[in-house]
């Protein structure tokens, strides 16, 4: 960064891009520079003498209970842009092996449905419905088969926003709509999913009373911000209280799944091994001859990690590099 020169944030540039074509070039240049410095150049410094990169998974750094990855952070390989995704092609298994990658589908929304006991959302998951299309149908009062792609995208933002205690202001910024319209989406959501509203409100009340929240498995997260004299800090504390039982329970489930998968691989005498966890995703390096058995084992143990009102769904891909397996 040049002294005395202000750096314009990316979100500001994105708003200017439609009016000034050069802005798109600036954003692309920043993106490419980031990919080169952080990943193309940055990862090469972590290659060990055995030709591999060995990350460190930390158990007690994040407040939510999620594992974090450091030196290097392999949980932060880009996924939103195709060029960033291609970085995964440099991660290869041993010769003759392949990767099996299994990912929980919408785990936090499934946890929300189970914790809240909201019958409508539980039923949607049990029926195998597209939960974002189902929510769009309810929130926008549109027949399920007539929901537009835009309505589904907006409903997806509301679904995930609710998990993080999003405000009308935050949702309006995310969707580029008025604050009044965003509040209407949120209000309609809670009318259609009343048990979710009750659950979130009760969770905040309990957190204020106790000073902490709990996951489904009883793991505690203190929230001192709820007692702050600063209004903004208290608001932040309320959002944390809403989200922590959901994200924390999801973190507990994936850790239980990791233990189950690891133990089963050993019990079955397989040479395949669990090599990485990326939030809701487990990556296994497997022998070609063990592939089918490993896929069945992996999906069974991930689904069986928790018994609740909403079943866990798992998607699995295989490939000869991490990109193809993701």
Predicted regions and their residues:
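Short acidic (Asp/Glu) and glycine-rich catalytic loops that position anionic groups and cofactors
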Residues: 1-10, 68, 87-95, 110-117, ...
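Conserved "right-hand" nucleotidyltransferase catalytic core of DNA-directed polymerases
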Residues: 1-82, 92, 98, 108, ...
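Conserved catalytic core of nucleic-acid polymerases
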Residues: 18, 54-55, 59-62, 137-270, ...
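Function-dense linear segments that define catalytic or interfacial modules
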Residues: 59-144
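A structural signal for short secondary-structure junctions
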Residues: 92-95, 267-270, 275-279, 306-309
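A common structural junction motif
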Residues: 192-194, 300-308
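Short beta-strand->loop micro-motif that forms the acidic, two-metal-ion catalytic signature
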Residues: 281-286
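Conserved short beta-strand edge segments in small beta-sheet-based binding/regulatory domains
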Residues: 305-317
């Amino acid at each position: 960064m040049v002294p005395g020169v202000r750096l314009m944030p990316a979100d500001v540039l994105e708003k200017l891009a439609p009016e000034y074509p050069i802005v798109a070039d600036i954003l692309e240049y920043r993106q490419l520079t980031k990919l080169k410095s952080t990943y193309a150049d940055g990862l090469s410094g972590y290659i060990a003498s055995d030709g591999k990169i060995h990350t460190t998974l930390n158990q007690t750094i994040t407040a939510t209970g999620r594992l974090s990855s450091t030196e290097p952070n392999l949980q932060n390989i880009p996924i939103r842009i195709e060029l960033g995704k291609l970085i995964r092609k440099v991660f290869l298994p041993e010769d003759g092996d392949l990767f099996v990658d299994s990912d929980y589908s919408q785990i936090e929304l499934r946890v929300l449905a189970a914790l809240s006991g909201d019958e409508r959302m539980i039923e949607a998951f049990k029926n195998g419905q597209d939960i974002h299309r189902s929510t769009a149908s309810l929130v926008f009062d549109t027949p399920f088969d007539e929901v537009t792609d835009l309505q589904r995208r907006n409903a997806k933002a509301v679904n995930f926003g609710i998990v993080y205690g999003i405000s009308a202001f935050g949702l309006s910024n995310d969707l580029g709509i008025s604050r009044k319209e965003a509040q209407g989406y949120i209000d309609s959501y809670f009318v259609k999913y009343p048990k979710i509203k009750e659950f979130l409100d009760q969770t905040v009340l309990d957190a204020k009373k106790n000073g902490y929240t709990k996951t489904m498995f009883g793991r505690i997260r203190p929230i001192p911000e709820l007692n702050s004299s600063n209004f903004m800090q208290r608001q932040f504390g309320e959002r944390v209280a809403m989200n922590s039982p959901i994200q924390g329970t999801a973190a507990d489930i994936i850790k239980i799944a990791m233990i189950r998968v690891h133990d089963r691989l050993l019990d079955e005498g397989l040479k395949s091994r669990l090599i990485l966890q990326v939030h809701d995703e487990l990556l296994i390096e497997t022998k070609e001859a063990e592939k089918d058995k490993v896929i069945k084992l992996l999906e069974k143990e991930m689904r069986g990690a928790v018994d609740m009102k909403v079943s866990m769904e798992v998607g699995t891909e295989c490939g000869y590099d991490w990109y193809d397996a993701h």
